[in-house]
Amino acid sequence: MNKTDLANVAKQIFTVEAEELIKASARIPSDVVKAADLIQNHDGKVVVCGLGKSGLIAQKIVATFCSTGTQAVFLHAAEALHGDLGIYHPGDPTILISKSGSTDEILRLVPILREFQSPLIGIIGNSNSRLAEKVDIVLDASVSREADPLGIVPTSSTTLTLAV
């Protein structure tokens, strides 16, 4: 690939990601306000949970919360099912991140988190998913396409999840 082709691919990636962000800005503002109110009006910490690429995004969200003075911790969805739930206090809000909304490990966590009376916020790429039905607030992170020319790498979806 020559430099001109590479520059065109880069421009296309930026364009697709920007388009997806603009589309999302029209559909989620009121839900973002609900989620922000929930987090802001809670005295404890926020737990952010994901797996795979969503887990990496969750870690970045935790870092941002901590930078702004909001206590937050990352919980790996698979590790949570194997003894890492000791971080919870009753009522700690939890943000569950899943592109598909059908991640088994996260779905298995929901009833356990309900026992902790944890309000659940989902940042979900499929608002018609099983996870979307189970959380209190859905932040719709769906994208019509990824910026990756092959459509297999989560590019637009991860950018949108960070923006939410």
PLM region spans:
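An N-terminal, well-structured beta->alpha segment
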Residues: N2-N41
